[in-house]
Curated annotation (Swiss-Prot):
PROSITE patterns: PCMT. GO terms for molecular function: protein-L-isoaspartate (D-aspartate) O-methyltransferase activity. It catalyses: [protein]-L-isoaspartate + S-adenosyl-L-methionine = [protein]-L-isoaspartate alpha-methyl ester + S-adenosyl-L-homocysteine. This is Protein-L-isoaspartate O-methyltransferase. One of its GO terms (cellular component) is cytoplasm. It is an enzyme of class 2 (transferase). The active site is at residue 60. Catalyzes the methyl esterification of L-isoaspartyl residues in peptides and proteins that result from spontaneous decomposition of normal L-aspartyl and L-asparaginyl residues. It plays a role in the repair and/or degradation of damaged proteins. The keyword Lipid biosynthesis does not apply. Keywords: Cytoplasm, Methyltransferase, S-adenosyl-L-methionine, Transferase. CDD domains: AdoMet_MTases.
Length: 211
């Protein structure tokens, strides 16, 4: 089911779970999540759950997409955001409607190619892609006002901290196995402030691109 009623049910659940940024909710409401999953799973697209997309990867739970987007935007509008882990392209599509420019890095080429096609279909033209290692970020185009990481890192990659602009916000899951925490890191005048925001579950952030 991909009816408007099904989408509204998801939005209601996100509100009940504490998502309050109206722009984020509006974008989640109008973004067709069923286009980002296999046809066989389309009937589950508006459930608040992660779903497999192949290559041992998942499309993130809508609540987590909303939560991470809300955290990124909490200090105001952003003009330049880097996403680590394009995956299906769903989080990318949401970001593209919330910020001025998105720079998305993915290590699995076939996933990135599919994501590109979906964003073209949705006429989202403010995203550029890099096929590469997410641990390295995209230093050539740094700094970024915001960075969002859609896979869990064993530690915060120094390269990503280095690419964060002053006042910039990094939203990243950190940990391993079943012990993972969502973190918000802000680049302050004299270093970084770190905020632990609760337990999460993500696939691991791996090294090295795969064709």
């Amino acid at each position: 089911m991909t009816s408007q009623r099904t989408r509204e049910r998801l939005i209601q659940r996100l509100c009940e779970e504490g998502i309050s940024n109206q722009r984020v909710l509006d974008v989640i409401r109008k973004t067709p999540r069923h286009l980002f999953v296999d046809e066989a799973l389309a009937h589950r697209a508006y459930e608040d759950t992660a779903l497999p997309i192949g290559h041992n990867q998942t499309i993130s739970q809508p609540y987590m997409v909303a939560r991470m987007s809300e955290l990124l935007l909490a200090a105001g509008p952003l003009d330049k955001v880097m996403e680590i882990g394009t995956g299906s392209g769903y989080q990318t599509a949401v970001l593209a409607q919330l910020v001025e420019r998105v720079f998305s890095v993915e290590r699995i080429k076939v996933l990135q190619d599919r994501a590109k096609e979906r964003l073209v279909e949705l006429n989202l033209r403010n995203v550029v892609f890099r096929w590469g290692d997410g641990w390295e970020g995209w230093p050539a185009l740094a700094p970024y006002n915001g960075i969002i990481v859609t896979a869990v890192a064993t530690d915060v990659p120094q390269a990503l901290l280095d690419q964060l602009a002053p006042g910039g916000r990094l939203v990243i899951p950190v940990g391993s196995g079943e012990v993972q925490q969502l973190m918000l890191i802000i680049r302050e005048e004299n270093g970084f402030s770190r905020h632990v925001l609760g337990a999460v579950r993500f696939v691991p952030l791996l090294n090295g691109p795969i064709a």
